[in-house]
Curated annotation (Swiss-Prot):
Catalyzed reactions: L-threonylcarbamoyladenylate + adenosine(37) in tRNA = N(6)-L-threonylcarbamoyladenosine(37) in tRNA + AMP + H(+)
Gene that specifies this protein: tsaD
Organism, as annotated: Staphylococcus haemolyticus (strain JCSC1435)
Top-level taxon of origin: Bacteria
Protein name: tRNA N6-adenosine threonylcarbamoyltransferase
Record carries keyword Acyltransferase: yes
Binding sites annotated in the UniProt record for Fe cation: 115, 119, 304
Organism taxonomic ancestry: Bacteria, Bacillati, Bacillota, Bacilli, Bacillales
Binding site for substrate: 137-141, 170, 183, 187, 276
Protein family: Belongs to the KAE1 / TsaD family.
GO term, biological process aspect, one: tRNA threonylcarbamoyladenosine modification
Top EC class of this enzyme: transferase
Record's signal peptide: none
Keywords: Acyltransferase, Cytoplasm, Iron, Metal-binding, Transferase, tRNA processing
Tagged with keyword Acyltransferase: yes
Length: 342
């Protein structure tokens, strides 16, 4: 293996077109991200067909910009990595087909990467992962607790039984007429409100690491409906604070309990909701109180980007795991499928 391993990574699982060049799994030479937020804002959420069209329009120039920014050519690249899933199938296929074309044209290995594994390895771009550890995954489509005993070993110990946390944020945001994307808007308002409303904290069975947010979401919607029926004032800041406190309490408490139960002193957080200031602050407090080392990526690495895909791909490359040119996208994939068996 070369002393320096350069991986060109492509991420198109949802509404960001991103291409990155990663050196040795932890050094970002370039990380270009084209966001589609403005295009989807008027619809109040991501429209799959619109997302796919934007990926088609932007993928070629994004690849070129990533190579130019890294000051390298395709001949310098050791492997091509791409998100295989989970995600929007149409969006995924744009990135996968681009990656397959490059792999064929330049005779490079093709590495399929699980999107959530990428989110986890965003942490590795800023601080080396040490094992064992617990990962709290919080995003629009996933809420999970994962135990890792080594690189690319994923054991799910808890997951949502209904809504993902990011999905709950977006639905509550729409209920109080906040613009898309709703999660950051609630987080911003929550800094100025009061914990006025007694929204439920759903703990489920004793010692369970699973999550449930549908009841909380329904409670918020019903409360707002009742207030409006009575022509009472709805203080958006108070709704945001009360809702966020409920979510953060459950996420942080279960994450800390998992660390204690599995006897690990390292907690990492992954996914778009990891940029939430309320969650970051609460986890920092609890980890300090319990002597647990906490790692959360910078906000720019919490949201979808190709650098995280390149970071995870490095360990597949080291293990000799590649895909054939008939690689297809998968809209649903369990994170445990991404485990490298040693």
């Amino acid at each position: 293996m070369n002393k320096e391993t350069l991986i060109l990574a492509i991420e198109t699982s949802c509404d960001e077109t991103s291409v990155s060049v990663i050196k040795n799994g932890n050094s970002i030479l370039s990380n270009i991200v084209l966001s589609q937020i403005e295009s989807h804002k008027r619809f109040g959420g991501v429209v799959p067909e619109v997302a796919s069209r934007h990926h088609v329009e932007g993928i070629t120039t994004t690849i070129e910009e990533a190579l130019t920014t890294a000051n390298i050519s395709m001949n310098d690249i050791d492997a091509i990595a791409v998100t295989q899933g989970p995600g929007l199938i149409g969006a995924l296929l744009i990135g996968i087909n681009a990656a397959k074309a490059l792999a064929f044209a330049y005779d490079k290995p093709l590495i399929p990467v699980h999107h959530i594994a990428g989110h986890i390895y965003a942490n590795h771009l800023e601080e080396p992962l040490t094992f064992p550890l617990i990962t709290l995954i919080v995003s629009g489509g996933h809420t999970e607790l994962v135990y890792m005993k080594s690189h690319m070993h994923f054991e799910v110990i808890g997951e949502t039984r209904d809504d993902a946390v990011g999905e709950a944020y977006d639905k509550v945001a729409r209920t109080i007429d906040l613009p898309y994307p709703g999660g950051p808007q609630i987080d911003k308002l929550a800094q100025y409100g009061k914990d006025t409303y007694d929204f439920p904290r759903v703990w489920l069975e004793k010692e369970s690491y699973d999550f449930s947010f549908s009841g909380l979401k329904s409670s918020v919607i019903n409360k707002l409906h009742n207030l409006r029926q009575k022509n009472e004032e709805v203080v958006k800041e108070d709704v945001a604070t009360s809702f966020q406190n409920s979510v953060v309490d459950v996420l942080s408490t279960k994450a800390i309990n998992a660390c204690k139960a599995y006897k690990v002193n390292r907690l990492i957080v992954a996914g778009g909701v990891a940029s939430n200031k309320g969650l970051r602050y609460r986890l920092q407090q609890l980890c300090e109180d319990n002597n647990i080392h906490l790692s959360i990526p910078s906000p720019k690495l919490c949201t979808d980007n190709a650098a995280m895909i390149g970071a995870a791909a490095y360990y597949y490359y080291q293990s000799g795991i590649t895909a054939k040119l008939d690689l297809n996208g998968e809209n649903n994939m369990d994170i445990e499928e991404a485990t490298i068996e040693v």
